[in-house]
């Protein structure tokens, strides 16, 4: 089940998030692939083989186990002195480094984009990376680095093409600015750039840039020894949790906090940011996807976070995921300079005993989600 947290101002100091469930979503699940890796010597003779099954994004959707086997064999046999294990390890490390550099984006934290987007210039084939826009290239069933490709009828496509809205990801701390003011009446949402005659156009011409910063005062902070994949839902859009933030072990990353008074409205109601948080050690390409039942990743991740501002105050939430009651392999708490309320998820319990989640109001200063 996917749901969006709506932050509302209550008469009490503590806000309680409201939830709704859309009637439409499109699932992009990574398909399992069987890969046979064959090691050969300088004469081309097989010396060792290994078969693995995984949900891999390393191969394109058109690539089969046979072609992966052939590629691995030729790569390893190219030098009689090569170490096949080291070669594969190097390839994996290179791939991970490429993904990391891609999702980090090109802007330093809270540095404004400087180049206005030009309508009718960029081809629809791929997302126009830069100025805060990042490509998401591990989603099975989507090409070009897009996060959702959908038209007004709810039809989806592998490729961004004429008549479709092509949604995109922004780097951590930023939010997309593009969605049409006229939304479908059936409750689904659409967002992104519009493809017309093979070129990309803004669907919201009130904003010259594709990404914008939210509040500067909320961060994710890690006090643990493994990375955490924090996955924002693509909204307005499919609501699939494929917008990545990587919280490095012992590091910090900005949290996207949208202003509910000015950001996208769903049927007139204010909306906020929602994240699905995977167990520590799960990579963004494995965790920032639409997961499968029991997988523990994506929409089955153990923790959901909410953030947003309205009326000059910021609201931060820890929300139970009804898909997954298992406790994560970390604890998490919200702390700040001036907050009303107490909110933590420790040893599988909210605030020590509850199971209904919790919300705090940030009156002033900074706040953070601390993983410990």
Curated annotation (Swiss-Prot):
The lineage of its organism: Eukaryota, Fungi, Dikarya, Ascomycota, Saccharomycotina. GO terms for cellular component: cell surface; extracellular region; fungal-type cell wall; mitochondrial inner membrane. It comes from the Eukaryota. Induction: Expression is up-regulated during biofilm formation and down-regulated by RIM101, CYR1, RAS1, as well as by host macrophages. Pfam families: SUN. This is Secreted beta-glucosidase SIM1. Belongs to the SUN family. Its main location: secreted. Residues 1-15 form the signal peptide. It comes from Candida albicans (strain SC5314 / ATCC MYA-2876) (Yeast). Cell surface beta-glucosidase involved in cell wall maintenance and cytokinesis. Plays a role redundant to SUN41.
